[in-house]
């Protein structure tokens, strides 16, 4: 830590400063406190000679005054590495940095106090008496400046030297005061050996001197900011002890306290240093707790974020887009499975049998997402094979280039499959991975400046001595050694240019939620040439695939580019080592003025317009991605997680929130029961009633249904992105397939009824007696009930997502935003289905095959009453409106019961009467024939009432 009124030369590995200027403030005004910005970027604190020898600290870490100097986070990491090596347990570098920051802040507060109380630091030297000189002499021996440490001069000589016109006694007294304050701080306990005051207590009148210092400042005016009244100000000693009193066990919390209490006096530049120091603590916590995978609950989606302007610019759908049903297939695994099914080698895309395309068409599938089509990283494959996966291919998301893989048949094979799929009404879909690319990709070799990198390793404990993974003689590629031992997950890899000698450490792709993707290289989106290169690649993909899925798209929204890679001070911590490379909001806006995805959407719409853009996006950004950024579709992970966990009230709230905000967002959700990163649908939902109930919701709610690889067949293995073939020996669940044929595929072929939102309505299910619909009841949040229409077609879906029994009424819809009026509106079930007030409605339950008849008057006044068992589902379709008194008889006779045919029931009730009437008419005819009168021909089915659709 720099001592006031002392010159020092600071030399570190990456920082060379000569510091002599002492900040002097003419007042405590906020405006003028900015002069603190001229302070050095370096922080210092005391380290005893004993600790220096124990840990073998580097000479360049110390200033001439003997204090350890932390010029940047890298210096703190080197210091912590030395301690870690000796102790055998990790010393967080962020703690070392925090020690230096707190020490620096205490010095600044002393300087500020001097401005309020001029000459106080000169008076205190006289007040503590002659004993203080002996104490300061001992202090200088225990915590020696460089010249004393190297025996170039003794401690007394050093103290007699003058800096800025006064001896070093005064500045050393200030250092000793801060040393004492530091020793009273419980949070520094793990590091107390660095600056332990015990040697001073044992061999000098140190305790007496410290007591004299305390008494002196009690008698002086208190200290405070300009807003603090004189009577409310505390002594300087109390002010300096306050952080440890407020947060005795946390250095980070102490920094937060100092920031909140004294930030106005520290100046903007130093405030940012504190914020970055707090971020540094967060980064160390992240780095020490890499776990991977999804953790925690999925939050209920809301639409209240205002980080960036959220205007409405939906991309209009082409006519085919709302009816799309997407099937995901891991390309290599699927080809291997087809080879076994058809008993012949099926290795290329053009060898996929037409019979398989027939099957997809029969099942109502209109989109085929082929995962892993692109040429993959050779380094990624080598890494996996070196770790024991001998038959692995590279990850499907660590790419070499956007060319169809040669072993899949290349572009010719794709063209063949694309044409044949189109004959079956199926469009092909491919991934685009914009966030990162393979560590040995063409871009890493040819355009290293396109990637986020450092000229040095961000952590001193990283080593890069393993195999060269490069397939190009021009460069060397090495990942960090601890990967091979599974003891660390480095945030960078090493790229060595054999032609120029350039060495840089490129960041791995990372979304901040788990471990870095260590076979990938992170692109630098602050550079316009990178953004343009990615847009050109997207256009290339769009010209070959009408459906593009963007991997981890949320990481490239502006707010997350900054949060992850260029964090504002105080907002870092997501990715270790990035806080020190952050930007202010203004700096970031200058670098990336526009949302990248908005540019992509507009360019694709102009150049390849018949392309559906699908974003894998989470983090509460679903609405923003489709409504403002213009993506056609966006992942809705809440569907899978909440329905699996039976967080039914939460998912109903997701739907309600979406309807109240903008129903068009609901239409653009991608709903799924598994995705390649999650367990299979059979593992998560089983293969019985709950599975079919949730799947029914998936294919009848607005949005894009996405069916997983092997889901229909009941396969349970989760296929890794590096799999060439399935590893489990599984058989198709024929009963499950038949269940789909009976319950699901008839619905997929009627997707047009369910796809849109203009007539979609969600209902509350009130648990009430069947004869008491008007009484107040309780909403059963476990029941999902909704209706939709497409012209004259009507549909009502009801599903009970719980193993329990319930009964109640469906009557009024939840509120939905009417964009024409700008108001929230509700409708009754009868209004939503456009039913007449009189007449009768006949409809079929596609789950049971039974038909029902209800009075339209009852549907209008009461709604519909249902009794539901555990995981029971109804899909009421084929609504017909009939009139006539005879249908009243049919309705009353059935009393809500379902029958195979309502018309059959009608015939059963009235066939005898019809026959009697026919016999009577024949008698009249015969009688008239005998009398010679002209006979009118009877009308066919004249007793049947009129039916309307």
Task: Give a label for each model feature.
Residues 836-861:
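Solvent-exposed beta-strand/loop surfaces of large extracellular or lumenal domains
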Residues 375-426:
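Aromatic-lined substrate-binding rim segments of carbohydrate-active enzymes
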Residues 2-346, 405-419, 423-426, 438-750, ...:
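Alpha-amylase-like alpha-glycosidases and glucanotransferases acting on alpha-linked glucans and related
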Residues 352-377, 381-386, 540-549:
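Catalytic domains of carbohydrate-active enzymes, especially glycoside hydrolases
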Residues 770-830, 877:
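Carbohydrate-binding surface patches
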Residues 421, 915, 919-934, 938, ...:
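Extended alpha-helical scaffolding regions
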Residues 883-930:
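Charged, amphipathic alpha-helical linkers/stalks
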Residues 859-890:
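C-terminal beta-strand-rich structural cap/linker in extracellular carbohydrate-active enzymes
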